[in-house]
Amino acid sequence: MWLSLPWTVKMVFGELVDSVPILGSQRRSYILIGAAVTACGMLVLAGAAGGWLTFARADHLYVLGAMLLVIGTVVQNVVAEAMSTEVVPRRDPAGNARPEDDVRAELGMVQVISRLALSAGVLAVAGLSGWLASIFDRASVFLLGLVVPAISVIGVVLIRSETHERRPLDWRILGGGMAFGAAILALALGSVPFGQESIFTLSMAVICTMLVIVTRELDAKTRRAILFTSVIIFAFRASPSVGDGYFWWTLDVLKFDGAFYGTLRQTAAIIAVAALWLFSKQLTEYSVTTVLFWLAMAGTVLSLPNIGLFYGLHEWTQAMFGYGARSIALVNAATASPLAELSMIPLLTLIAFYATPGHRATWFALMASLMNTALVAGQLQTKYLNQIFVVDRGDYAELGSLLIATTVIGLIVPIAAIVLFGRRV
């Protein structure tokens, strides 16, 4: 819970980045601060692992180091999101407004590059971490991690990008965000009845209120477009999942194991990066709602093999073609894995397009919070569906109905939002 708190109050960091320059800088200075905090976290973890930091117990040092890493990451993430909206000019050299389609396409390509960099970094760390851990001790591995903030510092030195937008600090966002974080922490630690529902309701109320504050100065047409954009993003991200029942079933009935699931995850991650690169043109040049529509359709179609496996599809394919459940799962993971990554591009493009001058970091942070709240809505739906279709370890009689229900909801809700509001964004 503690490590998720900085992400929960991300709008606080966004407000600071938007309105509080440090040494005259609202971008580069915060990147340096984030890098410094990250470096401190690495040093604390190295000291805890190596035993040369003794001012606190090792477990407390690990928590402190991890918290510093998260804070540094959040600060740099907030700045990067704001800069991703600023790098594309909205006006040509003559001062005329550029065509919206061109701006959207370029913003989309920026998001593609950002996601590619993030995915490549995750794959690189996953590949190197095990190898480094086999050669060096833990303290040395953490010290090698100082390369990461060093790259940020080099970027600040080489690229002198800076915003000239200035506005006063909005204490409603800053104070409200901190109070919101405290309330979420109290609900999470206090074992309150219906705690998840309470957190969801409070989050929606706070985020929607802050979005109204941030967009208050915009014209009515733009505010309506932002509202419809928010509804589409929420609907697309709020799809329920099956829960643990299907995973248990694959272990108990199909006899999948940890090694096979590791292969599935590695295959999915690599193919997601490749698909993001291959489909970058379609993701950025077609309309956002068109891309989201077809991604929702594809997600539904690619859910069918999982349903088929439950009803014996693998037995038929084994008899007819010679390949069974593992082959179907591997092919399905390879084809379905890019969808989550691909769907982020049009969603982030919509957010970047409507980022308001002077509120870019705060806006992006609030919309990221909205997407996270949508995931909570999906988790609540998952919980309720599992109460209707009860699936326990070893009792999978209702798993088929649960799979069908989640697939239908995952299709109808986003498609309905796109059909109703897609033409207005």
Describe every region a protein language model picked out.
Residues 1, 251-260, 392-395:
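Short extramembrane helix-to-coil loop segments that connect adjacent transmembrane helices in Major
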Residues 7-10, 38, 98-126, 268, ...:
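Glycine-rich segments within core transmembrane alpha-helices of 12-TM secondary carriers
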Residues 7-25, 133, 274-294, 386, ...:
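Helix-to-loop junctions at the C-terminal end of transmembrane segments
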Residues 17, 31, 97, 105-107, ...:
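Membrane-interface helix-entry/capping residues at the boundaries of transmembrane alpha-helices
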Residues 32-57, 297-322:
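C-terminal ends and interior cores of transmembrane alpha-helices
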Residues 49-64, 75, 87-242, 256, ...:
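Intracellular loop-helix junctions on the cytosolic face of multi-pass helical membrane proteins
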Residues 75-95, 342-356, 362:
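Intracellular juxtamembrane helix-capping segments at the cytosolic ends
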Residues 357-390:
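A late C-terminal transmembrane helix in Major Facilitator Superfamily
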